[in-house]
Amino acid sequence: MSHESIADLVAKLHSGKVGRREFMVRAAAAGLSVGLIGNALRAAGVSAQDASPAAGGLPPAATIGAPGIAHTTDTSKGTIKLYSSWPLTGSMQGIGGDAVASVKMALADFGNAAGGFALEYEALDDGVAANNGGWEAGKESDHANKVINDADAMVHMATYNSGAAKIAIPILNAAGMAMISYANTYPGLTKAVEGATEEGEPDKYYPTGKRNYMRVCPADDIQGGASAAWAYDEMGKKAAYVLDDQSLYGHGVATVFKNQFEKKGGTVLGAEGYDAKASDYQALMTSIAAKNPDIVYVGATVDQNPAKVLQDMRSVMGDEVLFLGPDGLNNAAFVQGAGEAAEGAYITFGGYTPDKLKELGGPGGDYVDRITATLGHAPDAYAVYGYETTVVVLQAIEKAAEKDRAKILEAMLKTEGFKSLLGGTWSFTETGDTDSSIIGLAKVENGEIKFQKAISG
């Protein structure tokens, strides 16, 4: 958007044709930073109060993030490069694309500058069309090596899939570079959980013996436990069948659900991995139905054919058998893929869905308004964490004020009291996990994922 069109927008604001909030949202959606929007308003004679981001409902760096970190748009020290790596292909295109848009929005809100450096960003795609957009190990390794060999690169924002993180973390760790994820939830990346993580985890991912990895979303030991407690205690489900897509993430969260459901007193009639490349699950569902479960839990991501699993489940079992899945299914692609079979499905998520953020209002609601205007559709649930991940990185660069991987990593690990778009604050623990434990429960209603309530273990 040109400065001339901004002036037109300001004129509409003064004439009453456009409200101040709409002006801020439209200008931000066009890619202008908070500073440029404020400058344009002041140049047009709008008061300083009206020009402030808070007055317009725009969530700038000042309204979220760790306290006491000053921001400057000076770029005299040179350039810092930021990379991300997650799927941007096939069924994952919308999910990954929404996260990239959130990263770019956060960068724009900081004026594409931090700590005296100009910021550049490159989004890498670790997905492959042949795998329905799912990540590929060779690409993940190539991306990690590309990043550590770029002298301007200070931080890698990666990955979406926990299995991909297993590959990238050791490469970044050996190079002493920070890696931060907006979506990894497998516990074993940061901590050992009895019965749910592999032998040697997480230490085997950190060859230097020092931590370099963080995540801003709650891990699956929290999500799986909350899911089991809700199913058993609140829904009265006593007999579960547990499926997973045989990925690190899917098997991990399904195992936590299984273990916690049994600890509650529930019966697990069976637990197995399904073939994500199969074209039909009728025989599987017929065999499961014969065991008379009252709930089927499916640990999977959308690119691993869970929509077909649900369709075939519904063709064999009635609606009285509850379907429950984790955050890997909390996206429009899953609902669209399953079609009518998705109605009534329950899905958990480590946070709040976009509809809940809008209901809460404040910076989170404004974020949803802005990113929706940018995308032309409601964002993927995880996209909000893409924004927060970026703010963590930018504030660390501000604190370090040097082009130094070690100092930026140290600053990131010390993030505390971070004001979240979800409301409240969170801090990183010594393992690099967020101490936030918000788990949201959603239900598919009329083809849309609708927030129901917050749950806990």
Kindly give the residue locations of the regions a language model identified:
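Beta-alpha junction/loop-to-helix N-cap segments that form part of ligand/metal-binding clefts
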Residues: 68, 94-99, 112-200, 216, ...
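Extracytoplasmic ligand/sensor domains, especially the bilobed periplasmic-binding protein
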Residues: 64, 68, 153-271, 324, ...
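Extracellular/periplasmic periplasmic-binding protein-like sensory domains
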Residues: 310-387, 445-456
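Periplasmic-binding protein-like
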Residues: 84, 147-160, 178-183, 241-244, ...
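Segments of small-molecule ligand-sensing domains
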Residues: 370-383, 392-451
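C-terminal segment of N-terminal export signals and the immediately downstream linker at the start
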Residues: 17, 39-78
